[in-house]
Amino acid sequence: MSTLDKNLLLEMFRKMEEIRRMDLKIAQLVKKGKVPGMTHFSVGEEAANVGAMLALNEDDLITSNHRGHGQAIAKGIDLNGMMAEILGKYTGTCKGKGGSMHIADLDAGNLGANGIVGGGMGIAVGAALTQQMKNTGKIVVCFFGDGATNEGVFHEAVNMASIWNLPVIFYCINNGYGISADIKEMTNVKHIHERSAAYGIPGMFIEDGNNVIDVYEGFKKAVDHVRSGKGPVLIESVTYRWLGHSSSDPGKYRTREEVDMWKEKDPIENLRKYLVENKIASAEELEEIQAQVKEAVETSVKFAEESPFPPLESAFEDIYAD
């Protein structure tokens, strides 16, 4: 049994519930035509996001990717502001200009999601260089999917971070598919983290990315390594997205049997069973958390729907940095 604190375990459960319920609610709003632009959901990948994020200090920084809802929530974004942003409202965290794929929350240390595959990697290296030069003690985590590891910027970013011994973790959430392309067709290495050897940095493998405790404990080792000044780490966590690549993808390249098999590994249900069976938390405690999260999500929808769209003059705001 894990020695992790009960409060931490309950926070894991709460954050995963927030991600699941927010994404499913957003999916409903997409079908109603209320969400402009593309959306990419994190359903099924909750543990891979939450376990990693809770291993960080609150003031550490991240860069996200197009499938960034889970990362934003795990990093502590205000749910009202997030929902408003996704609906394109002026009360959103980016005043409605970012939407689903470009959501950012600088107050929480989220430097932003990115619609360009691998687009956050150079930003993460730059942010890590800043922390090193200013001696802040903060580290940066760059979130990306398996498909991004075949982009040229992956090589450039990891190589530069290695040369300069930067405080950055490159975190690959491997869900097995780059849109519809099976990872086995895209690379000859068995595991993506093995590529770390080419850059002279450690590679870490979290085989069960649906086990939030495994993710947390594995990630904590990487965090300690980087924060102690030993340089970057490449981590790979294996998980699975239940839904299509995006809101427009029916996922016909996967079999129903494959999806159902992974749903049996539901990260939230796995943690719920663990907490109850080991008498860490009662079923009633967890149901109360679920009820609180459900209410918070409904409140976020009400807030977003009642919020105004950006005024025309706001198009000329935020063009230059202060």
Predicted regions located by residue number:
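N-terminal glycine-rich anion-binding loops that anchor highly charged ligand groups
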Residues: 14-30
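Cofactor-binding active-site loop characterized by glycine-rich and histidine/acidic residues
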Residues: 24-27, 34-164, 182-188, 193, ...
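Short, proline-centered helix/strand-breaking motifs
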Residues: 166-170, 202
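Short gly/pro/ser/thr-enriched loop/turn and capping motifs at secondary-structure boundaries
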Residues: 70, 176-179, 241-243
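Charged, compositionally biased N-terminal leader segments and the immediate start
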Residues: 1-11
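Conserved thiamine diphosphate
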Residues: 132-136, 188-221, 264-289
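Glycine/aspartate-rich loop-and-adjacent alpha/beta segment that forms the canonical ThDP
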Residues: 225-322
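Short beta-alpha connecting loops at secondary-structure transitions
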Residues: 177-181, 201-207, 252-260, 285
